[in-house]
C-alpha cells in the first residue's frame, strides 16, 4: 500500500470540495468504479420445463428450469456479465447420506453446464463443489456416527463431484465445502485427467455466518440441516489471521482465484487478502445481505438502486476483483443505462 502522506496544504489553499463540485470532476478523480464485467450471477436451477419457483426469502430471485436458465443466460450475455454460477435445488428423493447425486453425470448440474456451454460458449460457467444440496442431513460432507464430518472421506466425494462438473464442460469450479486438502486433491485429479484449463475459484474464507439462511431455503437444505451448524469446518467470524492461512494453503494447493464469503461483513478480510497475496480475489454478496437490502427498500427505508450500487462498489474499493451477487442483472441493467 502507498505510504500515507500529510496533506500538502491547509485551508483555504486546500479546498477538497473543489474536486466534488460537478459530475465531470467527480468522474475524473473517482478512484474505483463498477462495471458489468465485475459481476458474477448466481442462479438456482431445478427440474421441470418453463418452471420458475420464487424464493420467498429472496425477493426477485427464483429457482428456474433449464429452459428459463437459458433465457436468463441470454440476458446476462447481452448485459456483459461474464460468468454464471450454478446452484442446484435437488428433488428430496435424490438426497442421500453421501450425496451421491452430486457426481451423477446425467444430474441436474452437468446437464445445465452442457446446455449453457452449447448455447453460449462465450459465457463462463462456475459450478459449486459441495455436498449440502445433495445430502439428506444438509451438511457439506460425510458424517461419522457422532455427526462429525469425516474430512478425507468427504474430499474423495468432492473430487468425484468436481470431475463430473469438469467433464460436463464447467470452466470453473468453486469448492465451497471448507474441507482440508480439497483444493490440492481436485487440482491433482484435474491434472491427471487432462483438465489443465479448468480453473478453481476456492471458497478459501467461508465464515460460519448467519447470513446464509435464504440460500439454504433456495437449495432446500435448511430443513435437512435443522438446528445443526457448520462451525467445525467453516471459519470462526472472529478470525482474520486464520483467513489468511486458509488462503495461503489454497493457493499452495493450486487455486487460481480465492473468495471471501460473506462479503460486506468481512470487507476487512477482503482487503487483507488482496494486500497480502495480490491474487484474483472475489467476494460473495450472500443471500442474507441481498435479503436485508431488498427488505429495507421494499419498506421504503432505503433507495433500492442507490444502496445496491453503493454496496457493490464497496467490494471493489475493498480490493475485490469481482462480486458474486444476486443483484447482478439489476446492476448490469442500471450500468447499461448510465
Set out the residue ranges of the language-model regions.
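Exposed beta-strand/loop interface patches that mediate assembly or binding
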Residues: 12-18
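Alpha/beta enzyme core
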Residues: 2-10, 22, 31, 35-40, ...
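Acidic, Ser/Thr/Pro-rich intrinsically disordered transcriptional activation regions
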Residues: 18-25
